Structures are given as C-alpha cells and as structure tokens.
A protein has these predicted regions:
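C-terminal coupling/interaction segments
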Residues: 280-359
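A generic structural signal for secondary-structure junctions
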Residues: 84, 101, 110, 149, ...
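ABC transporter nucleotide-binding domain
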Residues: 180-279
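Hydrophobic/anchoring residues in structured secondary elements
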Residues: 16, 267-270, 304
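Pre-NBD coupling/linker segments of ABC/ABC-like ATPases
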Residues: 2-4
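ABC transporter nucleotide-binding domains
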Residues: 6-11, 16-215, 219-220
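A short, local hydrophobic-aromatic micro-motif
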Residues: 12, 61, 263-266, 300
Length: 359
C-alpha cells in the first residue's frame, strides 16, 4: 500500500548506449508522489531517451526504473495504465470536435459511452475548455490544443503525467493558465508530474525540484534554492546591483574597472534593464558597497543571487562542458548519435497513439 510520501518514480543506475554514444549515463533519480519535477537540458541531453525508458518503449543498456513499484521494462503495460504522456505537439483528429476526441479516448481506455461523455464534460470544465467543446479540433490554437491534450491525458485518471514542453509556442496568458493547471493537478489531485522543458522561467515557477541534464548525465538535482547554495559552496557568488551617479544608471569604463578591482570578482555584465550582474569567488557584498559609496555612487539596489534558475542552469552547464573537454560521450555528437536521435524522434512521435490504446 502506497502513501503520500512514497516515491512514484525510482531510477537506479539507468543507462542507454548506442555504440559508443552514451545517451543516458548512470542516471539515479527519485521523484515523489504529487511532486512537480522539472527536467532541464539542451537537445540531445538524454531527456527523450529517459522518457522512452520510463514508458517501456526502449530497453535500458543497464540499470532499471520503476513507476509506483512497477518495473518499467518488464511491466510496461501496467505502467502504461498509470502514466499519461503529453508530447510537445499534441495530435487530435482535426475533423472531430474536442468533445468527440475526448469521448473517443475514453472509449479506447475502456469507458462506456455514457461514462466517457460524463468524464469528458467534467474534464473540459476543469481545463477551461467547455466553450470550445463543440468546435472541431482542427480549428484550435496551440494553447487550446495543449489544454485539450491535458484533458485527454486526464481521461484515463493517471497517477503520473509526463509532459514535453507543455508551454512552448503559447501566448503569455495561455502559459499562465496551463502552468496554474499543472500546479493544481499536483497540489489538489496528488498527480506526480515530470516536465521536460527549455523554459527555465516557467519551470522555476511551478517545479518543486529540478534536474539538469547534460550529455546523458544528471549533473545537478534539487530545489532551486539548494542548487544556488551548492554553487556558493563551490565558490560561486552572484550579485545584482543598481547604482547611479547624478540620477543616472552607470556603465562606463571607470565604473567597470572599479568593480573588477575588487578581489574575487570574475565576471561583470549589464542586464537589459541596466542592472549590473557580478560574479565572484567569495562574498564581496561589504567590499562592493564600500567601494561604491566611497566613489560617490548611489546604491539603489543590491542583492545576492541564488534562486535564479537561468544563472544556475548556465553555471552547471558550463561546468559540465568544461569537464567533458569536448569529448563525445553523450548527447548527439557524431554520426552514430545523429542516427540514434532520429530514431528516438520517430519513436517519440508514436507515443500519443500508443497511450491512447488504453488498457
């Protein structure tokens, strides 16, 4: 019998090799019930391969994965009944209405016609799509298709939902609606959600934890504040400063040289809004403030970064790239990996159809 604190996804030493290419390399990961987990990484990092192994659609080279205690390779059919998959490009029958698409999905998952209609009506209201229920799916915008996609996934009452770029190509208001819905599915329904995405801002807003994937390896995993603190423990401190002189934000050679002269400063840059971003190997707040005040600058803002996922991702990614030193151990380097990536895309494109087959 499972409880709220049980792990829903457990991955142990999971690897997938294509010849010498390590698409996924010794992955260990645990995702809790009701957790929203963001999986970040560039194309070819191993995110899609990991998803395919979780869904039992490709066998691992080594290691294993379980979903709610079920072996993803040996018990893939049972896993399929627990998992809903939302691809980045949701496909529906364009000549059928949104309602009819959901009813069809419900029937494919073993519901009677009456049960399918009732559940479709309830879910369309839940995702805010009742107004478009009788419109043909082919007329839907991308945001509407994504919401219908979430509704389609919910028809089978999943315990886990795996989403691939759920907010890509959607306008800001649509993004807010979808991210709010995702958070509600975890908080109110207790559904475990794993999101694979490049959208760092949205991942930061809704995820309980994130994992950063680079070249087949999970190089960092944890809450965003934890990852920021880990960087500081490794000697990386980040600061944002707004400084003015004579009422204007400053960014001249004299100002830059003054900042660079502070012991420990490694990087100085300017954001679009005029905020100065500084990175250092130690905590320079006191020295920085003293230098600015003594040079007659007015300090409007100064705070230490640590919860900005964009900076965290960039730093971990740069560290992983430096460690690899240009080696071709993962990702999509080389002709073999290119061929493997093409194969994975073809398999991934069939996921929606596979998961609509139901029980």
């Amino acid at each position: 019998m499972t409880t709220k604190n049980d792990s829903m996804i457990t991955i142990t030493n999971l690897s997938k090799y294509y010849g010498e290419v390590k698409a996924v390399n010794h992955l260990d990961l645990e995702i809790k019930r009701g957790e929203v987990f963001g999986l970040l990484g560039p194309n070819g990092a191993g995110k899609t391969t990991t998803t395919l192994m979780l869904l039992g659609l490709t066998d691992p080279t080594a290691g294993h994965a379980t979903i709610d205690g079920l072996d993803c390779t040996k018990e893939s059919l049972a896993v399929k009944n627990k998992v809903g998959y939302l691809p980045d490009n949701v496909g529906f029958y364009p000549a059928m209405t949104g309602m009819d698409n959901l009813i069809f999905s419900g029937r494919m998952n073993g519901l009677s016609k009456e049960e399918a209609i009732k559940r479709a009506e309830e879910i369309l209201e839940r995702v805010g799509m009742t107004y478009a229920a009788d419109r043909k799916a082919g007329t839907y915008s991308r945001g509407m298709r994504q919401r219908l996609g979430i509704a389609d996934v919910l028809m089978k009452k999943p315990e886990i939902i795996i989403m691939d770029e759920p907010t890509a190509g959607i306008d800001p208001s649509g993004v807010r609606e979808i991210t709010t819905l995702i958070r509600e599915l975890a908080d109110k329904d207790g559904i475990t959600i794993m999101i694979s995405s490049h959208d760092l801002y949205q991942i930061q807003r809704i995820s309980d934890r994130v994992g950063i994937f680079v070249k087949g390896k999970l190089i960092a995993c944890g809450r965003i504040d934890e990852l920021g603190h880990q960087l500081m423990s490794k000697g990386l401190f980040m600061f944002d400063v707004v400084a003015e002189k004579n009422g204007e934000k400053v960014w001249n050679e004299e100002f830059q040289n003054m900042i660079r002269s502070i012991n420990g400063v490694t990087i100085i840059g300017r954001r679009v809004d005029g905020t100065v971003h500084i990175e250092a190997t130690r905590d320079i707040q006191k020295d920085l403030l003293k230098a600015l005040v003594e040079a007659d600058y007015t300090v409007r803002e100064m705070h230490q970064e640590g919860g900005d996922l964009t900076e965290i991702y960039r730093k971990y990614f740069e560290a992983a790239e430096a460690e690899e030193g240009g080696s071709h151990h993962g990702g999509d380097k080389g002709s073999t990996a290119e061929s493997s990536a093409d194969k994975l895309k073809k398999v991934a494109g069939r996921l929606t159809a596979v998961f609509k087959e139901g029980k």
